[in-house]
Amino acid sequence: MKASQFFVSTLKEAPADAEITSHKLMMRAGMIKRLGAGIYSYMPMGLRVIRKVEAIIREEMNRAGAVELLMPVVQPAELWQETGRFEKMGPELMRVKDRHDRDFIIQPTSEEVVTDIARQELRSYRQLPKNFYHIQTKFRDERRPRFGVMRGREFTMKDAYSFDRDEAAAGRSYDAMYAAYGRIFDRFGLSYRAVAADTGAIGGDRSHEFQVIAETGEDAIVYCPTSDYAANIELAECLPLAAQRPVPIQPLTKTPTPGKATCADVAALLNLPLTQTVKSLVLATDDRNDGGDIVKTTVWLLLVRGDHELNEVKAGKLPGLKAGFRFATVGEIDAHFGCKPGYLGPIGLKQPVRVIADRTVAHMGDFVCGANDADFHYTGVNWGRDLPEPDLVADIRNAVVGDPSPDGKGVLAIQRGIEVGHVFYLGTKYSAAMNATYLDETGKPRLMEMGCYGIGVTRILGAAIEQRHDARGIVWPTAIAPFEVVICPIGYDRSAEVRQAADTLHDELQALGMDLMLDDRGERPGAMFADWELIGIPQRVVISDRGLKEGQVELQGRQEAEAGKLAVAEVVAQLRARLRD
């Protein structure tokens, strides 16, 4: 490929609305062009990366026994009404009507359609297992699309859906996809980690995320450096930090804390460690009648240590909170505690509340908490002596660095990641809702067990750049770079010798199957080098009159500080060795 035949368009400065590194570099490198909020055209340079990502995915999915199909972007609402997601998904689901006033959706995912296919086509146990996948455009009407391809409204994903006869077989399909994902991300050449994760809105009870490691990642990954334990912070289990509760030493004392409404301020005032304080968070749940009217509101007091943060995902799985909760209103707090937030605690309540203590708080003694009186806190608080035992003790906090690993093999560390893949075991969530059954050996209908497996194809681009860039631009892994090699001839438009050498090398490398670009635009060396460093091509060959007179060319890897000189006759072998490695 020659640059004059391709489309190379770079910018010296990123647009003002580009916020993060990947967004800035993709815009500057001419890989994407903004069309609307969260909607981008993928320009030729960016599309080449997408096609390479898709090719790796296809090869490994096919190798794992999955079968490719293509499901529509626009789907009839009836299928989504069968599962209840037409109403449940909210404004993120784009709903449209056709000229006949029939409801449709623009798909953010395809569980309903693929389950409809399965219930029509997979009638016998002899047809199972089956795994269908497609690579398709999706749309989610994000309230605030941002960060370029990282959180756009229109994007491309690979979705796979497995159908099995029983839970054991579904587990094998899940494991096969988990292994395939490992091979896919290994081939991408990115540093990543597979972590146990919450199933979220998709549903199911087994889930792993594949996270590309990046300091700018939105997700916190909790892992143990001395074992294989890894989980998303939403799911990472927090063990009690003390084996048992200490014997009380201090008396219960109501202590003035004027104007100190945070645990940090109280600890500083009382010259106590923050770990000796307990923070109070007040939630509420509403019971409704068939007409949707609230018939009963229950108030909940959740207690976590002062230096810890509430994990709302964990809290939402507890009895009484599973159906959904909200943070209590100021009026509800005043009615139950008789005090404003900042001084709340479990002692001296005006009305009963349900008390849930984090595991760590349940093992604390002589702790500090709000006194339900403005500008006062209790010190020397002990369970059993000063207040009843909590209604429930549970893991309701986020893990922190240094916590004991749940597998007992060390302590936890935390790094940032960008979710680019997710695998779920769904069970019969969708097959039951849509009556997707097969006939077993006895002719009895049974629900199919399902799994779903997604990879954010376009998101891979942003994640790779967030992980791999420097001051000059993108540093693509070779496997997904738009081109593997760029030939930069100095004076291509002026020197017959340079032109002949460049064309000869281009043809020879192309005949060997290398994916390369010959920059024949006649740009100045500095501008030419800057363009390809910005775009991030892994290997660069520089051909000049001066070098040719010495029988040499320059070869430089994208991450190498300096170019190396080598004989013209050696450059092909050297490139083959580098690209093979």
Swiss-Prot record:
Protein name: Proline--tRNA ligase
EC number annotated for this UniProt entry: 6.1.1.15
Reactions mediated catalytically: tRNA(Pro) + L-proline + ATP = L-prolyl-tRNA(Pro) + AMP + diphosphate
Keywords recorded for this protein, A-Z: Aminoacyl-tRNA synthetase, ATP-binding, Cytoplasm, Ligase, Nucleotide-binding, Protein biosynthesis
One annotated GO molecular function: ATP binding
Notes concerning its domains: Consists of three domains: the N-terminal catalytic domain, the editing domain and the C-terminal anticodon-binding domain.
Entry keyword annotation includes Ligase: yes
Quaternary structure annotation from Swiss-Prot or TrEMBL: Homodimer.
Cellular component terms (Gene Ontology): cytosol
Family, per entry: Belongs to the class-II aminoacyl-tRNA synthetase family. ProS type 1 subfamily.
Record function comment: Catalyzes the attachment of proline to tRNA(Pro) in a two-step reaction: proline is first activated by ATP to form Pro-AMP and then transferred to the acceptor end of tRNA(Pro). As ProRS can inadvertently accommodate and process non-cognate amino acids such as alanine and cysteine, to avoid such errors it has two additional distinct editing activities against alanine. One activity is designated as 'pretransfer' editing and involves the tRNA(Pro)-independent hydrolysis of activated Ala-AMP.
Major subcellular site: cytoplasm
UniProt keyword Aminoacyl-tRNA synthetase, yes or no: yes
InterPro entries: aa-tRNA-synt_IIb, aa-tRNA-synth_II, aa-tRNA-synth_II/BPL/LPL, Anticodon-bd, Anticodon-bd_dom_sf, Pro-tRNA-ligase_IIa, Pro-tRNA-synth_IIa_bac-type, Pro-tRNA-Synthase_IIa_type1
Protein location: Cytoplasm
CDD domains: ProRS-INS, ProRS_anticodon_short, ProRS_core_prok
Species of provenance: Methylibium petroleiphilum (strain ATCC BAA-1232 / LMG 22953 / PM1)
EC class of the enzyme, as a word: ligase
GO biological process: prolyl-tRNA aminoacylation
PANTHER family: MITOCHONDRIAL RIBOSOME PROTEIN L39/PROLYL-TRNA LIGASE FAMILY MEMBER, PROLINE--TRNA LIGASE
